[in-house]
Amino acid sequence: MNVLEKEILFIISRLRCLTENQFNKLYNYKRDSKKKTLRKTLRRMCNDYILVKFPCNINYRGYKENSYLYYINGSCEYYEGDDLIKTLIGSDVAVRLKLANFEMVRFYRNINIGEHNYNLYIEYIDNFYIIKSICW
């Protein structure tokens, strides 16, 4: 298993699912040759039954996603409907925080804090070492 495959498994294990567009954003591949190696790696991981790939076609209030969705094979939860939309938006926020060089401390979905119920809760440390959170 090479370094790219290990990074992909680590990220998907933390976020539960990612789309192909989010992989491209995360690894910032602008040249076609690097994109092809990422696609080949994802295809190889699907053929080896490490990942499961599903088509994804979502249009939710300006958030559009038409690429493929990747899960770890054998994970206990596959999301559908509103849960899938919440999961993808949460994954997209986490990818953008990682691209901004913020350190993620906690990443939760469907959590109760006190009397409040949140669909998404992300706690991170910004570049000035201040702990901040995103609740939705």
Map each language-model feature to its residues.
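Nuclease-adjacent, charged terminal/linker segments that flank catalytic cores
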Residues: 1-78
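Short, Lys/Arg-enriched charge-dense amphipathic segments
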Residues: 45-48, 77-85, 124-135
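Solvent-exposed, charged helical/coil patches
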Residues: 64-111
